[in-house]
Amino acid sequence: MAEKRPLGPLGPMMYGKLPRLEPDPGPGHSLPLSASSQDSCNYKGAYFSCPIGGTSKAGSERLASWTPYPSLYPTGVAGSPLRGDNLLTNCLLYRPPTEGSEKIQDSSELLPFGPQAHAYPGPPLAAPKPVYRNPLCYGLSTCLGDGGTKRSLDGDWTLVTGPLLPSADPPCPLATAPGKGQPLDGTFLRGLPSGGPGKDSSLPFSPCQAFLEKYRTIQSTGFLASKYTSPYPGDAKQAMSEGPSSPWTQLAQPLGPPCQDAVAAHYPLPPPPQALPCPPSCHPEKQGSYGSLLPLPPLGAHKGAAYQAGGLGSPYLRQQAPQAPYMPPLGIDSYSYSSAPLPAPSPGLKLEPPLAPRCPLDFVPQTLGFPYARDDLSLYGASPGLGGTPPSHSQNSVQPVPQPGAFQRACQPLPASQPCSEPVRPAEKPTPEAQEKMWLPSCRKEQLQPRPNERPGVPIVIRDSPVPRTSPALHPCAKERQSVPQKDARPPSSPPMPVIDNVFSLAPYRDYLDVQTPEPRAERDSAPATSKSQDKDCKGNLPAQDGASRSHCSLREEVALDLSVKKTMAEGVPVKVPSPEVHEKPAEAVDGPGIENTVSGLPGLKKMVTEIPEVTAEATPRTNFHSSVAFMFRKFKILRTAPVPAAIVSSPTTPAPVPAPAPAQPVPNPPSVPVGLQILTQPLPVACFNLALPSPPAIVASPAPASAPPPSPAPAPAPASGPAPSSAQVPTAAPVDSPEQHFTGLHTSLCDAISGSVAHSPPEKLREWLETTGPWGQAAWQDCQGVQGLLGKLLSQLQKFVCTQRCPFPHVVRAGAIFVPIHLVKERLFPKLPPASVDHVLQDHRVELRPTTLSEERALRERALHGCTSRMLKLLALRQLPDIYPDLLGLQWHDCVRRQLGGFDTEARTLSPSEPTVTRDEPESQALAGKLPAPKVKKPGRKPPTPGPEKAEAATGEGSRNPSPSSGASTSPPGPTLRARFRNLLENAWLNGVALPTWGHKASGADRSSPHPQLLGSQTHHL
């Protein structure tokens, strides 16, 4: 509503510029402090009340007794006493018609208050009688109390009508205006006509208006001369164009006529709003400064005048907000206060120290033209002009809504949720009464742009201001002025917003992703969600300023809000710093590095990948869209890389059955493919490998060759699987994938490897091992070729049984634990070991065998163990088998060595090993029967002469197999000589690495020779 009122040069801002007088100005100042405690407007300064003419002696005396600080006033003004006959009305200093303008200048220069802010001259003062009596408090009787002196002033304001200024309200003495107003410069009264202020005048203007007009016409008054040539009723825009070029021209100047007669009667007269430091027509950034440093008559005075232009009578006005004290420039005439700002920044502004962007600007005058009090800066809002750091947000100072004049920008704080994206008067915190700061929606639609060419005054840096603030709607003048800096301002580097009602499109981002700009950040609002709507309004209202405002907002956010984005900006295009994105988006953290690796070879994709973390990092306002972008890119990446892994995996999977390691090799071959692809392809080769792993060992004999070929120097390991599997080959072939067969095959291969190692070792070495190694001979047998690998596989199988609780052997489950009968260890796995030795190992490991219950024993017997005794059915925890298994293997090795070195009596050696084989001819132990005849490992050596094994007891057979060592003794007759000869042959065969025929099972020997080709065939088939 305030915006709709007619534009006038005077607005509430002018009233806000009245200075606060120090409560204790000094020895030369006798200004009494008025009851500041009664000030409901939080005004704590002294109230200076002046009677009109001589109506109130107390007021006149008070004025006479007051003398200004000489140092603060110009030299010509310092010594001149305040003229008692001058009329210092509540709102208007006007002189009696008898005195000349010179005297008025003297007296006016001494006045530190009054309508000083009106820097523009008005037409000649036509109305001799001041019309306004209402003090600055706008009828708030509690403002200054009802002193007799103040009441006496009422008589002089006889023109005031009841509706305009309720007579009941004591006019706050002009000093209240000083609290809010500007010091009355000498120039303010220089324009007073010598005969203007007589009470006999009946012109329709308010005296203030007439005074201002007169003030405006005076060209010789100093700082106002030649500045305000437009007539009083002249158009505001005309005044704007005619604005002075003084350093103050950039300050907000009222655009409307100085006074518009009593229209404000329609509105109640609440206290003046906090004067907006900066009208929209001028610097939007000078929010903290005394934006319109126009000398303003006190609000009360203009209020009676129906200050329409200022909107003072509007119901929006609440309590008088503490205003920043106005500080006049160095001299009265040193700066001219123009009613209209020049479109171009005045050069005088450049003299001021440069201001940090987005900081409210203020001018610090070198010399103050009036004594002002800065004891409580909080009352002033943030008044950096005082030279001290203003309180950024005075929590306890009531700062009502600034009622902007029609010409003024309403600077209005936004909700706290919105971060401040532009400089705003820091003191304008919303108060209970300030809730209607939201009354003007356009005020929140603007984002203030600091103009680089105008940085005068001391910057007010709002460090931790939680209250987001936006500058009010800019005047056309300000828009024009701001459009100039926008030309050189860099447009936002991000593409247009593609989200419409949560429906996104990547089309706008195509060029954005392909061609990165130095700052490829999406449009960023200073506020997360609420600023979105604000932005929409801003775009509608200020399309020209949108780009620059965005860039400035983003700059501010970099400093205050989003450090990660700032880092990415600083680092530039090539490196986009995925680390912030990893912290902010843990869900995408996994993808971020992977994506970069994946597309390392693809430059086009690399750009998109490096960009995605950046976009997602700043996605706070538009999380849905950016997460969607990330998701789309993730999907795109998968589609892009999926075909490659398929090709890679398919090639290894087809040959996978033959070599298990084959799948692993093709995968490393495409390291030319990005690492990201390997991440996708690796699981498949691993899966293939896992699938291939069970199949080869499924056959009892297959694992042995698989591990045996690596140790090529020793041909023993491969045939080791052949001895007993000849008989076990047929049953095992059917259940190829049986875990039991797999485990049994591993165990058999391991035992055969140990036996072969012992058979190939010379007796001296074996004796040395027996002496040096421990009771189980771990160190010796673990050095055997292929033993370590087989042992690892077998132990892993046992662990797998324990973890999966799927044991292939007869077992019992107790409380989730698997127990196997000891029969598995003593009869099936290690049938050659003496039971006492196995028990000894169990004792060493403190393994407890638990008896079975009747039901468990019945179940075990029904399952497989029909003829087992109860001792053999005692339970061993399967989880303990991996612990004792290596020691049991050590026992196996030790037994083999002992048999190898036991008695060289061939008869004893032939009988002892064969007996266990005969007794253990049961089907369940057939697969393990071949372990005992360890010398069978040398079968490859015997393989060419197949009949060799059949002549185990004939010296000729041995001679034919090894003619070189035993050729001379081959003709010896049988008998004792034959035995000695045989012993000789055995020793030679041992030294030559030939398998020792120490057992008499000729049929089994013949069978042993034949199944070996089948084993090889089966191995090739399955592997």
Swiss-Prot record:
Q: Where N6-acetyllysine occurs along the chain?
A: 17
InterPro entries reported in the protein's UniProt record: DUF5525
Q: Which residues form the signal peptide?
A: none
Where composition is biased (Low complexity), the residues are 963-972
Q: Is the keyword Secreted in the record? A: no
Q: Name one matching Pfam family.
A: DUF5525
Instruction: Please give the residue positions where the record annotates the modification Phosphoserine.
Output: 206, 383, 493-494, 912, 964, 972
What UniProt keywords apply to this chain's record, in alphabetical order? Acetylation, Phosphoprotein
The coiled-coil segments of this chain are: none
For this record, an example GO cellular component is: cytosol
- For the modification Phosphothreonine, the affected residues are 389
Where is this chain compositionally biased, Pro residues type? 706-722
Basic and acidic residues bias locations: 425-436, 443-454, 477-490
Name the segments for region: Disordered: 1-35, 381-501, 518-551, 703-742, 907-980, 1002-1023
Skewed-composition ranges (Polar residues): 391-400
Q: What is this protein called?
A: Uncharacterized protein C15orf39 homolog
Q: Which organism is it from?
A: Mus musculus
